[in-house]
Amino acid sequence: VAMRDAGCTLDEAVTWLEAEKATNNIFFTVGNLDYLIKGGRIGKVSGRAANLLGIKPMILFKDGEIFSGGVARGRQKSFEKALDQLMNYLDANGGTPDDYRLIVGYGYDEEEGKRLWLQTRAALRAKYPAAACEVGLLQIGCTIAVHTGPYALGMGVMRRWKKQQ
């Protein structure tokens, strides 16, 4: 919408979006491994063992592919790890949070999503006090939840478009 309102043509918008796809990353975790087991993305024995031990996989989506982002033990630790991954991304790519569109996404549990959203905003504001640190909060769709389960939770980042002078 910002690009349209600034007078960009459709071709200019598509060219910019294609070039910026590499800046898109999603850092997320799941409530348990049941849906990943059922979908064949993880073995039954290792998945059930991880569920019993409270191990949460950290999943990274970048360049159109899914990668392992490590593991965390317990739900709160998985929130913290996703937040660390976001902060590391910002450090590695420069700028401030205001140079990016940041979104916290949650599945079924809106309260859990709000907790991560508040933690994310607080951490960003502590590290970048001069930045506005806008962070959106959205519910993920059923297309994602069918693969991850209803309690997926994470954050997405994409570079913001700025009109060139």
Model-inferred region functions:
Residues 1-165:
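Mixed-charge interfacial surface used for oligomerization/domain docking
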